Structures are given as structure tokens and as C-alpha cells.
Regions:
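Non-transmembrane, aqueous-exposed alpha-helical and coiled segments at domain scale
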Residues: 2-455
Length: 455
């Protein structure tokens, strides 16, 4: 397209501006209360409306004392096993844990050595993309948004699958395992295409190594020299494990259930989940944390001065700093109260990486903000449950220390969560025999039709 010429696919014309005013009609807030609408499918206390059953994972953030709900330390279980024990197991045995976790979530049981080796071999074999896919699909139409490229690639894979629309359990499982294997490749290649064609950087396309773990392959594919340390790979692996699954009610997983209930194919269901995860209210929070800390570092002169940090946090809550949204990003969670177990696990190991990278001072800043933010929020806001750091608080810091570009933060979430989506898709197909269709109350008044000459 000629420079300075208007782009009809991008330009909002004055005519569109005028028409948009006709769309800007909000429903009276009082009607939501009148009809007891569970907005966001949540009750007034923040608890989600019960929409289904699952045995894939369980989140525990409350306990009952004297018939009263009392906040407690958060717990997360994958197929009934405490996430703390899962992490402890592969850390103590000096193994990578993502592949084992994927097996557990998909099949409901921990693999023995032979089963794990077979599953890892399957993932390695499936990491190869169809012939010319990279050239024809990824390189020819690079996007500034990696999630859009990833969703497009997933939908395009439908065309390469002779049984794409078959939703029998064995075929869906095969498709899901292939997508789990391919997500790291599709994500990194999408970034490499963007980095080359949009930013003019050198193009590096490494082939995936079937002998490497998922975390190792990500670093191998992304870095020009393919080099990484063991600690780097282990921390990335842990982040993938902790992002792999989080119940059926989070937006992208619920999207998977809703779309799967229609009987559609796997590629369409997973693409829909990706589009949900792309939303900044869901998958983009760790980027916001890093950007918030960048702003904090630019405005707080002395990182060891707690009073100066506290003043900045107050400005965040008062909508006077950063994006003026009134939020301290990385603090608080829709479900967890006193603690997010995933954040607690990450925080124990992030210090090691900060020492390897010479980022101890920055780590201490994160730890100070985590401690002070709880106090500041407690003083300024009415809290019905505890507030604590969530997984986004430290994951973005880990990714930045690994030198991962911001454009890949949300795709990394997807690389992990495709496991949970896959398990929930199969669970929906096995147990849900009705299309998900909640009710909406119509509140528009009845009107008479007016002939066009009388309007």
C-alpha cells in the first residue's frame, strides 16, 4: 500500500464515529441487581457460579469454620495431587517436570519411567511441522501480535489433517498431543518472523530437537546460539508446569468447554481458547507487571527506601501513576485469598536465577513491593478476602531475566495451558451431552415498526 494513503482496514472514518454513537447504549445498572444477574458468572462475594464438574484440577482458597467461609493458604491440585508435591518430586530427582505434568493432566495418573519416555518420544516426533508450513503460513504473513499468528497457525493445521473434524476420543487425543508438541515451535517461529520482517533483525530458524524437553526446546529455538544454562531451562520448565492448568472456570478453559460443547473440531476449539487468552484481562497480566516495575524503577530513585516505594504504590491505587488504572499488577486473584501456591513456589527459585543473572537488587525490589503492596491495599481498599501476590507477579520477572521478548509472554502461557485446554476438551466431549447455553433476560421495551417514509 502506498505510504500516507488511508488504509480502509484500519481507519475509523467520521461516518463510523457517528454510527458508533448509536451503539453506545448501556443497560441500566439497576436491572442487573433487579434480576440478580451473576455478572462475570460470579456471585457478589466473587465466588464463581457452579457451571460444571471436573476431576482435572482443584483450587482451594477457603475453609469452613463454624459454618463460616474463612480464607486460607491457597492450594492447587492436579488430578488430586498437590502441586507442591509434583514440583518437589521432579526437583529432587533433578528432572524436567512439564512432560510428566502433561501426562498426568491428560491421562489422570503419573507415568512410570517407560510411559514417560514413550510420551516424551511422541512429543519429540510430533514437533515437526508439515512441509513448507513455516515458509507458506508463518513467514509470508508475519503479525505484530504473536497470539494472532498462533491462532491462525492452529486453524491452518486443520487443512493438513485428513481427519480434522473427527471428534472421537482417540483422534482428539492425537490432535491435542500434536498441538502440545507444536505450540513452542509455532510461537517461537512467529516471533522470529516478526523480528525479521517487522523489525529488520537477523532471521534465525533452528529445527526443534526431539531429545530436548519443552523448556529446553523453547530456549534452543529462540536464541541465536541455542545456548542456555541448566538453571534457565529448569526455571522455565517450572513456569510451564505452574501455568499448565487452573480449573474449568478461567476464561480460556471455559471457552474451550463452551466451544467444544457445540461439537466443533479441535483446531477451532483451541483457536477460540487462544483468542480468549489473548485478552489483557486474562493472559497479558505478567507483561503489565514488568511494565509497572519499569515505571516504578524510573520514578523511585532509591530502591532500598521503603517509604518511597510505598508512596509509589499509593499513587498506583489512587490512579496517579503508571497506566492510572488503580491497580497494583500481580497482586490479588479472583480465587485465591491468603496466597497463590504457584507464586509461592516460583518465589523460592527466582532468587537463584537473579543471583546467576546479577539481578539480586531487582529481586529484592520485587520482594519489597510484594510485602508492602499487601499492607497498602489492605489500608486503602475494603477486602473481603486476603490479598497476595499471584503467579504473574514473578513470572514476568523470570521471563525478563531469561531474555524472553515481551511478545512471547502470553504465547508462553498458551504453550503451558494447551495441556489444560486439551484435558478439558476431552472431559467435555466425554461428559457433556448438551450444548452450553446460559439464559439472557431481554429488557428492551416493545415498539411498533415504523414505515421508512415516516421515520
Amino acid at each position: 500500500m502506498v505510504k500516507d494513503m488511508p488504509n480502509k482496514f484500519s481507519e475509523v472514518t467520521p461516518e463510523i464515529e457517528e454510527l458508533a454513537k448509536k451503539c453506545n447504549k448501556k443497560i441500566d445498572e439497576e436491572l442487573f441487581a433487579k434480576y440478580d444477574v451473576k455478572r462475570g458468572l460470579r456471585k457478589r462475594n466473587g465466588e464463581g457460579v457452579l457451571a460444571g464438574l471436573t476431576d482435572i484440577s482443584m483450587i482451594n482458597a477457603y475453609t469452613m469454620i463454624d459454618r463460616k467461609i474463612v480464607p486460607c493458604e491457597g492450594k492447587l491440585y492436579y488430578r488430586g495431587i498437590d502441586i507442591e508435591d509434583i514440583v518437589k518430586g521432579f526437583i529432587e530427582e533433578d528432572r524436567f517436570g512439564f512432560e510428566e505434568t502433561a501426562y498426568l493432566l491428560l491421562f489422570g495418573e503419573l507415568p512410570n519411567k517407560d510411559a514417560l519416555k514413550q510420551f516424551e518420544g511422541m512429543l519429540g516426533e510430533y514437533r515437526q511441522l508439515p512441509t513448507n508450513f513455516v515458509r507458506d503460513i508463518i513467514m509470508k504473513a508475519p503479525s505484530r501480535d504473536m497470539m494472532n499468528t498462533l491462532a491462525r497457525s492452529v486453524l491452518t493445521l486443520f487443512s493438513y489433517d485428513d481427519n480434522a473434524s473427527d471428534i472421537s476420543l482417540p483422534n482428539v487425543l492425537r490432535q491435542c498431543i500434536q498441538l502440545i508438541a507444536l505450540f513452542p515451535v509455532l510461537s517461537v517461529y512467529a516471533y522470529q518472523a516478526y523480528n525479521h520482517y517487522e523489525r529488520g533483525e537477523s532471521l534465525f530458524i533452528h529445527l526443534p530437537d526431539p531429545e530436548l524437553s519443552t523448556a529446553e526446546n523453547i530456549l534452543h529455538l529462540l536464541r541465536p546460539d541455542s545456548k542456555y544454562t541448566k538453571l534457565e531451562a529448569k526455571l522455565l520448565d517450572m513456569a510451564l508446569v505452574l501455568h499448565a492448568e487452573h480449573g474449568g472456570g478461567n476464561n480460556s478453559t471455559f471457552t474451550t468447554h463452551v466451544v467444544s460443547s457445540s461439537g466443533t473440531d479441535t483446531y477451532s476449539a483451541i483457536a477460540a481458547a487462544l483468542c480468549s487468552l489473548k485478552g489483557p484481562k486474562h493472559g497479558g497480566a505478567n507483561i503489565k507487571v514488568v511494565q509497572m516495575f519499569d515505571d516504578l524503577k524510573a520514578n523511585v530513585k532509591d530502591w532500598s527506601n521503603e517509604e518511597e516505594i510505598r508512596e509509589y504504590l499509593l499513587k498506583l491505587l489512587n490512579k496517579e501513576a503508571f497506566d492510572k488504572a488503580g491497580l497494583i499488577y500481580g497482586m490479588g486473584h479472583a480465587v485465591y485469598s491468603l496466597s497463590d501456591p504457584r507464586s509461592k513456589i516460583l518465589s523460592r527459585f527466582v532468587k537463584q536465577l537473579s543471583e546467576e543473572k546479577g539481578k539480586e537488587e531487582e529481586y529484592q525490589l520485587y520482594a519489597t513491593v510484594e510485602r508492602l503492596a499487601k499492607q497498602v491495599i489492605g489500608e486503602k481498599r475494603k477486602i473481603y478476602k486476603g490479598v497476595s501476590a499471584n503467579i504473574d507477579f514473578y513470572s514476568g520477572f523470570i521471563y525478563s531475566m531469561l531474555g524472553l521478548p515481551h511478545q512471547l509472554y502470553t504465547p508462553l502461557f498458551a504453550i503451558a495451558r494447551i495441556v489444560g485446554w486439551s484435558a478439558h476438551r476431552m472431559e467435555e466431549l466425554m461428559n457433556g451431552n448438551r450444548i452450553i447455553r446460559p439464559a439472557y433476560k431481554a429488557v428492551a421495551p416493545h415498539r411498533e415498526y415504523t414505515p421508512i417514509d415516516e421515520r
